[in-house]
Regions:
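Terminal, regulation- and interaction-focused segments at domain boundaries
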Residues: 102-107
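Generic short alpha-helical segment signal, independent of protein family or function
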Residues: 50, 83-87, 122, 126
Length: 223
């Protein structure tokens, strides 16, 4: 069986892995042009966050950002997501519907830093907020906490300006630690999650929330 993948006719009887997709698309100029937009959007967003971090550090003698990590979705991950949603595999559809091709995870020291950075980004006049999901104020049933923003920000090229979507996850060190371990347990170990494991994970999530609360109170006491 053959299928049109972003302008390429490809045999897909046995499926495609990341390496095969990358090889196929590496010579596709349109794919390279589109992914350049997302890479540049990540650089532009990271630059804005670094500026906010430096300004805050100068004013308050501490950094709100502990670390940042950016990523681009792999070709096969994009294709799988489009397949699941029944979308045609073409670039206009991808750009209009897949909002998390580019992503940045921002790890903060304290909960208040998360909301401070989100507020600063939302107040920048050329950033459009597409979606906002506050899992800190309203955690998921399993205890997961994080603040998710999907934004569009302008990227300036020699002859054009393009507004590119980027997903941002803002969380504290405790939130990130728990989310990373839970991801390992749930998805990488391929183990069935029973009620006992669910209960233990929820208790860990509650403990991490208490930890963040205590650290926030300590921060206020030291001011």
């Amino acid at each position: 069986m053959s299928e049109n993948l972003f302008g390429l006719t490809v045999a897909t009887d046995k499926g495609l892995d990341d390496l095969q997709c990358q090889r196929l698309l590496s010579e596709n100029r349109r794919y390279q042009e589109v992914m350049l937009q997302y890479r540049c959007a990540l650089k532009a967003l990271e630059s804005r966050l670094e500026i906010l971090n430096e300004e805050f550090s100068l004013q308050h003698d501490r950094n709100p950002i502990e670390s940042m990590k950016s990523r681009l979705k792999s070709p096969s991950s994009i294709m799988n997501k489009m397949h699941k949603r029944g979308l045609p595999l073409d670039f206009p559809t991808m750009q209009a519907n897949i909002m998390d091709i580019a992503g940045v995870r921002v790890i903060c020291s304290f909960e208040e830093d998360v909301f401070f950075l989100a507020k600063c980004l939302k107040e920048q006049s050329d950033i459009e907020i597409v979606t906002e999901k506050d899992y800190i104020s309203r955690p998921k049933p399993n205890g997961y906490r994080s603040l998710h923003l999907t934004i569009r920000l302008p990227v300036f090229f020699a002859e054009k300006e393009i507004h590119v979507p980027v997903e941002i996850q803002l969380r504290t060190i405790a939130m990130d630690f728990l989310a990373s371990l839970e991801h390992t347990i749930r998805y990488k170990k391929n183990l069935p999650i029973n009620a006992e494991i669910e209960t233990e994970l929820k208790e860990c999530a509650d403990s991490s929330r208490e930890w963040d609360g205590k650290m926030e109170r300590l921060l206020h006491l030291m001011r």
